[in-house]
Amino acid sequence: MTPGPTIGRAMVAALALAVSTAAWAGPMQDLAFTQRQGAIVPLDARFTDTAGRTLPLGAFMDGHPAILSIGYYTCPNLCALEREDLLHALDAGGLKTPDDYTLIVVSIDPAETAAMARQARQDDLASHATPGADRGWHFLVGQAASIARLSQAVGFHARYDPALKQYLHPMGLVFMTPAGMVSGYVLGVGYRPGDVRQALARAAAGQRAEASPVLLLCFHYDAATGRYTLAVRKLLRLGALMTVLTLATLLGMAHWRRAR
C-alpha cells in the first residue's frame, strides 16, 4: 500500500529531529534558516490582518513576546501541520495568549489574501478554541517588499518552484522579544511543550538562544507515486543510515562487554 501524506509527514517530522544541517551540503542548503539571534525585525513593515486592517508589524506584537510562523495558507504540505503542532504545544504547556505570547502567522505569498488568512485562522480555532485568540492571534498577508524585509531579518529563505507550483521553504518557528529582537528558533515540527515554553521565557526576558541544528523543508509529496522530492528522500535515507549506525554501535558495545 502506498503511504498517505499524513503518515509520510509524521515520518519526516520524526526523522527531522535527528538530522543536522551539516548533512545538507548541496542545492537545498540555501533553504535552511540563517539563524540571526539578536537581529531586529522591521516593526514598521506593514501587513494586513484578517479584518482587512493594514498596520505596522509592531502593532500586532503589542508589547508581548511573539512566535512567528512563516509559510503560506494554501500550502498543500506541512504549513498547517506546523501550526497544529505549535498550538498543541501551547495548550499542553498551559500558555495563554496574549499574556504569555502573541502568535504572528505571515504568508510568504504576496498573492494570498486576507480572506485566505481568515479561513486558516478559523480552521485553527476550530481545532484549538483558545481564549484570548481574538487579541493574541494575528494571521497576516503582505506585499512582496514587506515579506522580503521580514524574511531577511529572521533569515528565512524560500523559493517558488514553477514546476511544482509550490514554495520550497524551511520549517520552524521564530521567537521574538517584546522589542522585536530575534531571540531564538525552534525548527522542524513536532514541538515539545517544554521547548516552546523555554523559548518563550527567553524571549520574554530579552535573551538569545543557541542556534538549533535541525532542518526540515516543506514541499512536494507525490501522492500518486508515494515518493518525496529530493530533499525529503535524503532525510529518509539519512534516517535509515542513522538507525543502522545506532544498531551497529549497540551491538558493538554488547560484544565488547561480553569480551570483557
Predicted regions and their residues:
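Bacterial N-terminal signal peptides that target proteins for export
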Residues: M1-V12
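N-terminal signal peptide c-region/cleavage motif recognized by signal peptidases
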Residues: S20-A23
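N-terminal "domain-start" segment that seeds a small globular fold
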Residues: G26-G58, E84-H88
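Short active-site neighborhood of thiol/selenol oxidoreductases, capturing the structured segment around
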Residues: P56-L86, L103-I104
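Structural microenvironment flanking redox-active thiols in thiol-disulfide oxidoreductases
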Residues: R83-I147
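Extracytoplasmic/lumenal ectodomains and periplasmic regions of secretory and membrane proteins
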Residues: Y160-C218
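Juxtamembrane/start-of-transmembrane alpha-helix segments at the extracytoplasmic/lumenal side
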Residues: D222-T243
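Juxtamembrane interface at the cytosolic side of transmembrane helices
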Residues: T246-R260
